[in-house]
Amino acid sequence: MTKTVPPKTPAYEDTVGCQIALFEWAESYDTKDWGRLAKCIAPTLRIDYRNVIGKLWEAMPADEFLAMASSEKFLGNARIKTQHFVGAGKLVQTHEDRITGYHQMRVAHQRYSDDALTEVLYTGHGHGKATVQFCLVDGVWKFAGLEPEIRWAENDLEKIFE
C-alpha cells in the first residue's frame, strides 16, 4: 500500500534516481533504442497527450507505450530525428514511492525526405514544460508518465508526424 506524504523535496538518492530515469527516457527516444526505453519505464504509465494529439491514457501498459513510441507513425519512423532537451526542473515527492517532476523542455525535430537522411523535409521545435511521473519499482525509480505542455513552436512542427 502506498503511503501518502505531504508534498516535499525528495531525498538526494531519490532525486538522482529520477534524473537517471528521465535521462534514459530522453536518450532512448532520441536514439530509437526501444530496449533501453523498456528498461527505464514503469509497468503502467499515465500518458497525457491531450495537449499534443488530444488523447489521455490513465493506465497504459508498458508494452503498449513501447509500441506507440516505436511506431512508424511516431518516433519509430527512421526519417524522423529528435532531441529531447531537458532544462531546469523541480521534483516533488507526493507518496513514498511516487515523485512528480516539472521540467523545462525543448524538443527539436527533423523529418527527412529519404531513408538515407540526405535532405531535410521539415524542421519543427516545441518549447514548453513536461510534467513527468516517476514511481519506485523494486527499489529503482522508473519513468511512469508524461504530460507535455507546448507553449510555442518553431517552423513546421505540425508536419513532422504527418
UniProtKB/Swiss-Prot annotation:
Pfam families, alphabetized: Scytalone_dh
Keyword Glycoprotein included in the entry's annotation: no
Lineage: superkingdom: Eukaryota
Keyword Lyase part of the UniProt annotation: yes
InterPro entries: NTF2-like_dom_sf, Scytalone_dehydratase, Scytalone_dh
Annotated active site: H84, H109
One of the record's GO molecular function terms: scytalone dehydratase activity
Protein's GO biological process: melanin metabolic process
Residues annotated to bind substrate: Y29, Y49
Enzyme Commission code: 4.2.1.-
Keywords: Lyase
Functional pathway: Secondary metabolite biosynthesis
UniProt enzyme class: lyase
Family, as annotated: Belongs to the scytalone dehydratase family.
Job of this protein: Scytalone dehydratase-like protein; part of the gene cluster that mediates the biosynthesis of the tetrahydroxanthone dimer neosartorin, which exhibits antibacterial activity. The two different monomeric units appear to be synthesized by the same set of enzymes, among which the Baeyer-Villiger monooxygenase nsrF is the key enzyme for the divergence of the biosynthetic routes. The pathway begins with the synthesis of atrochrysone thioester by the polyketide synthase nsrB.
Name this protein carries in UniProt: Scytalone dehydratase-like protein nsrI
